[in-house]
Every structure is written in structure tokens, then in C-alpha cells.
Amino acid sequence: MIENGQATVARNPVLFFLFIYKNTIGQRFPAINPFIYGGFLEHGANIINHTMWAEIFHDRKFYYGIQEKEEAKPDPSNFRAAMAYIHKWTAIGPMSDIFLDKTAPYVGEQSPGAKLGSAPRGFAQSHISLVRGKAYTGRIVVSAEQDTEITLTLIEELNRQTVKLKAGKAWSTVPFSFTAASDTTEARFEITATGSGSFRVGAVSMMPADNIKGFRADTIALMKEMDCKTLRMPGGNFISAYDWKHTIGDPDKRPPIFDPVWKALQPNDAGLDELLQMCELINCVPNWCVNTGYGEPRSGAEIVEYVNGAPDTFWGAKRAANGRVQPYKVKYWNIGNEMYGHWQFGHMSRDQYVIKHNLFADAMRKVDPSIYIIVPGGFVDEMTTGQGIFIAGQPQVHVGSERDWAYGMLKHSMGKFDALATHAYPPENKRFDLKTGKLFDVQQTLTEWARQPAQRIATMADAWEEYKKHFPVLNEGKIKVFFDEWAFSFRDSYKGTLAVALAFHEFFKHTDFIEMAGYTMATAWMNVNPTTSSISAKGRVFQLYNQHFGSIPVGISGNSPQPAPQYPAGGDQPKVNTGSATYPLDVIAALTADGKTLTVAVVNPTESAQSLELTLEGFQSSSQGRVWSLVGKSLDATNAPGKQPDVVIKDAAFDARTRRFQLAPATIQIYHFPKSS
């Protein structure tokens, strides 16, 4: 709902009938799995390291060594480069006094050092954000050619704090702490010494003292408030060049690596144990993705044993030695990510990959037969719209063809998985042309714009119906679909919440086989800067449905059908446009699990006010109801960190005997009709 917006009331109200039969079997549908409100969290670039992880320093293990001067920030429009950007360490004193020990480094391929003299020598990192009065704790791993006093200095404009520590020939880890004197984004941290000889630094770390197992207290609190049911992680394309063994054990001894997928430094600090423990902190079920790109079945079996094995197994013992005796008992395992994509590290043909998958599944289930396996689906709609190999003159991928990845998985790997994964990232204001295989710009109304993600869910559902004809076992309902990557309009805005709401409505229509959805990225539920955070506009719409919509969808009908498709079915165009027969509104209903409350969600994705008349059949409501509304100051409204939110959820009482409702422009509302006693 747009507050204080100008609206034109529709002349003709939409008459919409909601039927809930006393014979409840006929019009009730399978329950909504709460995993529909799940997230996807890729460990690429700074996605986790600069939002969830509490580390203050960039490149704390000196992968890039020491620079003579700061590098310029990349153009923000270069999304990937901006995501990968980090602050580098710079020299204090001449570069000729700086060296990199590649012979006996503490971790990784090099450890920096400085030759000493009468003037301070060492290195520094700038542009550090701090909060006044907040305590920060850290540690530094140091050694010196001879006994040397090293000075750590935290500089905030005119304020300087110092900590002095001793270093000797052997590497030693020394703790330190500071309390910030100001709110700043431009603090500087220096590591220096004077005298003779030289000193080296193996690693250095500093975090807010209130960190929770290495994670930011503020973003952990927000993710817990989001009540996220499941997270798919740590990839993503990232996973296909990821070695999980680099991410366990002493964090200071984990090698920093250059991630070739995101072209970014990965310090491997938020590792396997940390991410699984993060899920425990926020009460979330992990869905772990395994590397089938550069990985091999042995590695898949080993990670299952590390995560789920008893402490007397080989890898379970290593987990116990790393501080976690009890197994994590992870049930959901994503074997591979988008392996149908030619861009995927380790990509191979479909007919070769199914063999590799089967080897992975057998090896992993030998370790733990109870695991639930999800595989890269690559449905024909996804393969047509850019995820598959393009053939000139044949842009559309048909069910059963060689380019239909899902068909190959169903044909050759049936029994080796429990669910197929599919992904969708529809571009804004574009349509896919089935004749040319190209995207074309289109002028769209707000309604057409907002329904694009829902349309892609529907094209996948169309494909599923075709797969059921080829593989009748799918009709039994045991094999599910995990829509574990989806997003639209990566800018956070109230406008984008309309698209999310309509996508939810489409998901709710397919509860017989869509078991999970993972929004890209789960961190998009928050807006974050280095010191504070807030739940984003999109986060609020997830909360609205997660907290207030029912779990048992019921049948509805209306007298205003959605318009017929403008374009031929296929690619990004479903056979029938999405939405309920209440055009231009979209309405969906569900009972709560106990059957005591009927919830009705209404989206007005237009820029005009609309009217709606409601009839309930087979359900007698009490007189007092409640309505929850998502309210934004404008379509562009967002929730900036540290400021009053511009997108909020508001609730109010209403007369549940009312049957006519006025819907403001760009409205998302959920009505509760309690059942009369």
C-alpha cells in the first residue's frame, strides 16, 4: 500500500467468489511447505564476508601482500567488480623495506614483513568503519628476527590508541583489544616496529566483541527475526571451484584463495562449520551444495562424513578435533549447481554428467543413506531462456530433446535423487522471442512488470506437466521440485515486493510438487553497511507471508479472468497467464493448520485503487477479523540502515462480516477471517 499516494477508484468492482466446501477434500490442496520462504546464500565475493561475517579487516591473511598505495574503487555499475572489491594493506615506509616471505609463510603462499630501522616500518589498512563506544577484540600472528616490540595503532581522526606486544623468532598469536572513540568510516589500523632486523605477520583479525561465533550480532538478529526456514549454500556457481577442506580447522591456518568464479578473494574464514553453526543460530535448516564441477565422488562422501559422521569415523574425528563432537545431521544435499550451464566450472555433456551424478549419489548415500538429494534440473523453460546451449534457428528447447537436462536426469538418474532443482532470473521489461532466441525490450504496465517471476514459475509448472507424461512415476508425488534460486529486480524497493507477493501466489498453486524456494540472495532480506543493518523492503514481504498467511491452500474462483497471453507459449511465456480470476487483482486463500482461520491474500499490482466483493461458501467467520498490510511511502521506498524504515507491516482490526473491500494502489494485504465457534 502506498501511503499518501494519489489514486483513482475503479468504476466497476471486481466480484470474486471464494469457495470452501464443507466436503474439505475437494477444494483443499497439499500444505505449503515453509521451505517456500527459504533463501539462497552464495559465498561468492563479499556476499557473506561483508554482511553476515564480523571480520573488520580485509585480506587479513595477506593474499595480495602489501601495496604501495590504495587502489581506486571500481565503477559501481560494474556489479561483479564492486562485489569483489576489498581494501588492501599499504606500506608504511619505503616499499624497499617491505618483503614477502614465500619460503616459510605462516599461511597461504606468503607472509609479509618489514625490515626495521629508526623510523617506523610496517603496513596499514584504511577506511575502517567503527561505532563509538563499541569494543573490538582481535589477534595477530607475529614473528621477528630477534626480540622486537611491535606497535598496533588504531587511528580515528585526531584520536590514536596503541597496543604494544612482543614478537620473537617463533610464530606467536597475541590478543589485543580497542574501544572505538568515534563513529567513523575512515579509521586506520597500523602494524609497525622500529629497531633492527625484521618482523613478519602471518594473520591479523579484529571483530566487534559482541560477535556471535564470528558472525555480526546485528545481522544474526535480523536473520533470526526473518524466521528463515531453510538456506541453500554455499553456492551457486561458486561451489564448482570450491574446496571445503580449505575451510575447516584453525581459521588462521586456512589458506586464502582466489575464487575464479567470482574473481574475488576468499579468506575461507566463514567455513563449513561456521556456516552450519550460523544455521543453528538462526534456527534454519541447511541445504548444503556439493562440488560436482571440479569435485569428485570421494570428496562428496568425505564431506557427508565430516558433517554427519560419528566422531569415531575418519572425518567425524576431524570434526570433533575442530571442536564439534556431535554430528550436524544435515539432511538436504544439493549435488551440483547448474551443471547444465556451459559457464559452469567442470561442465560436461548431459549424458556424461548423469554418470558422474550417480557416482556421487551412491558414494554419499553409502556414508549416510538418510540424506535427501537435490539435483540440477534444467527444465526446458530455463534451458530455452539462456541457461542452455544456444543453437541458431532452434532457440526453443523441447521436452525430451538432447538439450533438455531435466529429461536426462529423470531418464538416467531416477532413484538417485529426491528432487529436481530449477532456477529463474527473469530480466525486467524484456521478453524472450522464441523465433530468434533473443530478448527484446517491451513496455510494461506495473501489473505486467510485477508478474514476471510468477510467469516463470508457471512455465516451469507447464514443463512439469509434460515430464509427467513421459515419466508417470512423477504422478505419485514423491519426486519434488526445489525452486532454489529465484529473484527479480535486484534493487530493493517497495515495487519489487509486488513481484515477490505474486510469485508466492503462484508457488502456492503448486504445493503438490514445489517443495522449496530459495530467494537470491538471502542477504537481500537485509540492507547492510559495515556497522548497522535493517530488514529490507523485500525482507518485509517475506515476513508478511511467512508470519500471516495460512498453510493449507483452498480453491477460489472469480468473474474477471486474467487476459490471454500476448505471446506464444514457451520460454518465459506460460500457456495461461498467472493470477486468479479476479483481474487486475490477484487473490489466494489458505486455512491455518488448525483450520480455525481463513487467510486471504490480496495484491493490487496496479497504480489505481480497486474494489473487490468477497463471498465465502462453507465457511462461517466471526465478526472480528484482522488485516496485515505492507505499507511503503512510494514504489521506490526502501529501508536504509540506521534510518527510519520506509516500508513496514501494519495491522488493524476489520469487520469480518464485510464483503466489499477497497484496495489502494500497489497494495499487498492479508486478511484473517476467524472461524465462528
Question: How would you describe each model-predicted region?
Answer:
Residues 141-145, 179-181, 547, 603-605, ...:
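Solvent-exposed strand-to-loop "edge" motifs in beta-rich extracellular domains
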Residues 580-623, 627, 632, 666-672:
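Carbohydrate-binding surface patches
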Residues 619-663:
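Acidic, Ser/Thr/Pro-rich beta/coil linker or hinge segments at domain junctions
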Residues 187-191, 350-504, 560-578:
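Noncatalytic carbohydrate-binding groove/subsite architecture in carbohydrate-active enzymes
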Residues 193, 234-235, 314-348, 423-428, ...:
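Active-site groove signature of glycoside hydrolases
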Residues 181, 188, 208-228, 275, ...:
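An active-site-proximal structural segment forming one wall of the substrate-binding cleft
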Residues 508-598, 607-610:
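Aromatic- and carboxylate-lined catalytic core of secreted/periplasmic carbohydrate-active enzymes
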Residues 18-268, 285, 301, 351, ...:
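Extracellular and organelle-lumenal recognition/adhesion modules and their flexible linkers in secreted
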